[in-house]
Regions:
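Macrodomain-like recognition of ADP-ribose-binding/processing modules
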Residues: 1-175
Length: 175
């Protein structure tokens, strides 16, 4: 969302004050854009990259908000200022749990959509990680596996691990 939107409207749309998030559940929300179409990216004979809108494939986009304890802007209206969480900055366990809550929300939304292939980003593992970056990157695959293996969901045949709802779960690479 643009920083040019007045603060009261931003607050109404977000409905979460992440600067005061002292519990992981503050990050347990997912926003879904269903029935989206993505296009293939191609290279023309001149080496220019372009989107080939004739080659589209359906997808659903799921967005989550992970904790920010590493980036803070200079202005009060800055997105990073409005999301910086000093509690998570001081407490790795809270930060990790917030990341896990965001991943949980996203994976549950994807399972409810019937998503076959879940493509996961490293939530909060870049500039938002701050001093926790190395530890989170080392823990990230374990966090995903904990959710896929240990989270039990109701199914017609009884409880099943969340991971059974997907054909594949792909964790993107960080560079």
């Amino acid at each position: 969302m643009s920083d040019t939107v007045p603060a009261p409207l931003r607050l109404r749309l977000c409905q979460v004050d992440y600067t005061r998030a002292d519990q992981p559940w503050f990050y347990g929300h997912a926003w879904v854009v269903g029935d989206a179409a993505l296009s293939a990216k191609r290279t023309d004979s001149y080496g220019q990259r372009f989107y080939d809108v004739d080659v589209r494939y359906p997808t659903s986009l799921v967005f989550v908000a992970g904790p920010n304890c590493g980036a803070r802007g200079h202005e009060a209206s800055s997105t990073t200022t409005r999301t910086f969480n000093p509690h998570a900055a001081a407490n790795y366990a809270l930060f990790r749990s917030g990341v896990k809550a965001a991943l949980y929300a996203g994976l549950m939304a994807m399972a409810q959509l019937g998503t076959e292939v879940a493509l996961l980003a490293h939530i909060s593992a870049g500039i938002y990680a701050g001093t926790h970056k190395a530890k989170l990157r080392a823990d990230f695959e374990d966090i995903v596996n904990e959710l896929l293996e240990d989270t039990m969901c109701d199914s017609p045949s009884g409880p099943a691990p969340l991971g059974r709802y997907f054909h594949r779960v792909i964790l993107t690479l960080l560079e």
